[in-house]
Amino acid sequence: MGVFRFISISLAAVSAANAAQILSMPHAQTVPNSYIVMMKDDTSDDDFNHHQSWLQSTHTHNITRRATVQNAGMRHKYNFHKMKGYSGVFDDETIKDIAKDPKVMFVEPDTIISVHGKVDQNNVPSWGLARISSSKPGTQDYTYDSSAGEGITVYSVDTGVDINHEDFEGRAIWGSNQVNDGDDNDRSGHGTHTSGTMVGKEFGIAKKAKLVAVKVLGNDGSGPTSGIVAGINWCVEHARQNGGTNKAVMNMSLGGGSSSALNRAAAQAVEQGMFLSVAAGNDNTDARSSSPASEPSVCTVGASAEDDSRSSFSNWGPSLDLFAPGSNIISARPGGGSQSMSGTSMAAPHVAGLAAYLMALEGISGGAVCDRLKQLGSASISDVGPGTPTNVLINNGGAKGDGKSPKPSPKPSHPSEPQQPTEPQQPAPGEPSTPAPAPMPPTPQHPHTPFPGGDDFDFDGFWKKYFGGEHWRKMFSSFFN
């Protein structure tokens, strides 16, 4: 008995010593009792399946023993490339048990992620398209090659998209809804606006690219990190089954506090060959504090104003790769027409659209795209902010110049009013069903032609809606410049 007790104590000590780290998120708004668990890279499918079976029984045992009504359990499962993991609602004891599994890399509290844009004033000129095909500000035409992104698929990871908007010409499809609200629409307007900049006939850069809507944020422009990781997972798998990840672009005009889980998911997507354009954030602060903007392998985008200055709200710092137009940008509005919005959310889709354009024109893909954008860009931006290693504004390099965009509308066709949050609906218990990858539509034949303010966040509504009732390079690059 004494020997058995000694062995048990020794094993417990070893388990505690090797326990995975339960990360803290002191500067982020966390979702109570909701966590993201990441497994180690060498975790096999069998190991992962065994862990899930163990988790289910352990979670059930712990909530029964504590007689708690909190019984949500696992919500999302992640399994793409080298990344395996899951998210869910668990009690403290279950989280401690999870961390003891030697196959677990880390456990991270689930946090709130938000859009990086806001509806702005109307009656402003549309200038972003013209600026990225000109050597100086103040021009009116957008000159581009007629390939216009044909054969490339762009994933809008956002608030959803009005796929029936006339500017998309039938090239947009609905992909996945990770919000689990049963509403495959864009009630916010944010995702439709960013998508118009990427692929719209009038407002867009890659005018022949296809668009897939992946809803990860709700009507109030916010959502949990766990759902965004699930959205990335879905995009990678869909791209693999439909044309390949080397012909895919993902735009993420969103962000929140630093998240190892979100950065890891973004890095895995890039490693699989996708190009990721990410908004730097709207807090006029160092973007290293935000995810996924702080992930080195993505292309992190700051916002510029019409006079080629950094937009006053735009984040800055070593994480930034490029600048793109982000102030007073006119693009598509749900239900038809247009509206003006500002934010790094508006800058990132300029980069995503131009990435799709160059991938079709030059045959490049993945990590090479951000470097190519830097080569083609112009050193134009003033007041880039402390420690920012770039003042490059994106430019399409003149391309072949055999196409010309129609001049966008001089003002929004609808008044621009702030979108009011809608009372969220209670999701069904358990993990949300993820639709099977949707088939891509045939390519149509065409002629050649912000972080929202924290004080406005409805936490009670959010809770009801979702739960019922190479990092070092950017981090330290400023020290070596």
UniProtKB/Swiss-Prot annotation:
The family this protein is said to belong to: Belongs to the peptidase S8 family.
Skewed-composition ranges (Polar residues): 282-294
GO (cellular component) term, any one: extracellular region
InterPro entries in UniProt: PCSK9_ProteinaseK-like (IPR034193), Peptidase_S8/S53_dom (IPR000209), Peptidase_S8/S53_dom_sf (IPR036852), Peptidase_S8_Ser-AS (IPR023828), Peptidase_S8_subtilisin-like (IPR050131), Peptidase_S8_subtilisin-rel (IPR015500), S8pro/Inhibitor_I9 (IPR010259), S8pro/Inhibitor_I9_sf (IPR037045)
Molecular-function GO terms, alphabetical: serine-type endopeptidase activity
Compositional bias annotation for Pro residues: 424-450
Peptidase S8 domain location: 126-400
Keyword annotations: Glycoprotein, Hydrolase, Protease, Secreted, Serine protease, Signal, Virulence, Zymogen
Domain called Inhibitor I9: residue spans: 34-115
Protein name: Subtilisin-like protease 1
EC supergroup of this enzyme: hydrolase
GO biological process: proteolysis
Signal peptide interval: 1-19
Function, in words: Secreted subtilisin-like serine protease with keratinolytic activity that contributes to pathogenicity.
Propeptide, chain numbering: 20-116
UniProt xrefs under SUPFAM superfamilies: Protease propeptides/inhibitors, Subtilisin-like
The keyword Endoplasmic reticulum is annotated on this UniProt entry: no
Primary location class: secreted
Region (Disordered): 175-198, 281-312, 379-455
UniProt-annotated glycosylation sites, renumbered to this chain: N251
EC identifiers of the protein: 3.4.21.-
Entry keyword Protease: yes
